[in-house]
Amino acid sequence: MSVNPRYKVLFDPVKIGPKTAKNRFYQVPHAMGAGNDMPNTRAAQRGIKAEGGWSVINTGYCSIHPSSDDRPLPFARLWNDKDIASHVPMVDAVHEHDALAGIEFFHGGAYAANRHTRMPPISPSGIQEKVSELVDMHLTAPKIMDKRDIKNLIQWHLDATERAIQAGFDIIYCYAGMGFLPYHFLHPTFNNRSDEYGGSLENRSRLMRELITEMKAVAGDKAAIAVRISTDELLSFKSESSESEAHEFFELNGELPDLWDIKLSKWSKETPSGRFAEPGHMEPYNGFVKKLTKKPVVGVGWFTSPDIMSSQINNGVLDMIGSARASIADPFLPNKIAEGREDDIRECIGCNICASCYNQGIPVRCTQNPSMGEEWRRGWHPEKIKTKSSDNSVLVIGGGPAGLEATLSLARRGYSVAIADSEKELGGRINKESMLPGMSSYKRVTDYRVSQINQLDNVDIYLDNTLNPDDVLELGFDHVVTATGSSWQPSIMDEKTAPVAVPKTNSIFTPEDVFKGCQLKSSVMIFDFDYYYMGGLMAEYIKDLGHEVTIITPFEKVSPWSFNSNEVEEIKLRLLEKDIKVITEHRIIEIEESSVRVNHQITNKQTDINRGSLVLVGHRKQNDSLYNALKSNQEALKESGIKTLQNIGDSNAPGAVVHAVYAGHLYANTFDQEDDISSEDFKLEYPVIQ
């Protein structure tokens, strides 16, 4: 098969200064949680994308000086010549597949807490941007930069440019985005200088012009110089000579760098989850740039399909299709389009688990692509898997994300697999959760795996089949794995946060009951002590059904873990927009027929609140009765010829969908090893002691 004519435009080469990208697929800089501490992990992950057809592969943010220290978050570093070596493996891995390697320079300015280096932050005017999340807070106000500091900043960029060229990078970024130092020079709120670097936009952009010009002089024909810039706030600032300060900026500086990479000033707005944005949501912020420059323009926008990608090119919005999340979910997306295999694309679901990994300081993970982050330490590959080691057969019980991933990966290895599920449709929890507001993209977890399984002739599917232990013993499979999910339980929590069971009544429900269409009263109270999305989603869903909704949580906000996935503020806004009453820092301690008694988490003050129906969201229990029954009868397992029995996914340890998919993939990769899969057989990266 060959590329669909509609998508040929995506494979045009693009000249970027002295370099040429072989197509328009551009992996923009994105954090991957490895930094300089895990050079092999970084190289393998970026190299896989180059193998998959991306023409440009960039690092995440790379600090150029100790005054831009972002610990404890895992940033890349190019402070001195000793840092060069850690970048070379990535550059080599990218070049091996005829792709360009880019590096994104980062100076955080007032944002950089410098917790490790203990240097004072620096900024144009000594103004610290106030934030609401603890991880971004620090106690040191920035120093006001003098002319010497500005000269030093430029020199740090030039020194880093020379080091990047030594490492072999093809594209070098000057980063004027988010709340970082070059951006603060552009921003009238954070730059109130009275010298030639402040005042008019022409003056405020002077530093950028000097950085770009001098970096280009150092790079020569060895590397292109790109600029990554946030436009949303500049678009809101009035200009005396143009439509906005953003327009004026590009009119002044549009031809200076070799490429423009457009982003927003706030990461959570640029990379919202699929609950809160549609593909192409960035067009209001990047669609004007091409009219003001002849240089190539790249931008993101949660592009997951070749149709919207090609439309961005054909409609003159972008020159190159920028991607972070789609390149994580399917590193081979470009090659699949080139080969006419669009139906085989593993589409990003927009869950932002990848973003959450950076915010937690760990290597990036992906719900759709369980090999992400495991390329080096486990040797996993998104499109290849080791062949079977025997002719044994495998029975997978449960058709949710864990069971589907196990089935697909086992079948790709060459095993004969049967998957049985008690429902009439494969999907498990995905079928329920994808019906909630904004969650339809989660169906891609099921759709991808079912479509791939249907192309294989070594998988048998048995739906509407509830197997009991005797059935399993009689079926004659060599290996059995249960992936039977978990169920929400009717429970509240005690003062130690342990779940306390609550008797079910005709007015007390769980999400399981809501999914089944239980009869709710006009007023519904939700007690949510789950960290993640279910409580807020239940509130939205029930509100959309026409009920009045109150949500009570013991935490400071609803769905607090969702800060990690860049969703917590959007969740808060959505609840406010839907007029859902939120009571935080309270837990239910008693339930009466028409009221609940709540206890304030700080003051211990108790209050009675009237209620209608009550939905309890917080504790899930493994559906492991089948597994336990089989496991308890080892003699019967032996007599029936079952060599191994495993329990995976939510039926083993309830978690997010990403954990279930990973569990299925891990099982398929390791079930025929001599060692138990609980023995973590992966490589570690060790520091060199000097």
Which positions does each model-derived feature cover?
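Flavin-dependent oxidoreductase catalytic cores
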Residues: 1-397, 401, 406-417, 489, ...
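Short gly/pro/ser/thr-enriched loop/turn and capping motifs at secondary-structure boundaries
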Residues: 268, 327-330, 425-427, 489, ...
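Short beta-alpha connecting loops at secondary-structure transitions
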Residues: 269-275, 296, 319, 430-438, ...
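Rossmann-like dinucleotide/flavin-binding elements
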Residues: 388-419, 462-473, 484-499, 505-563, ...
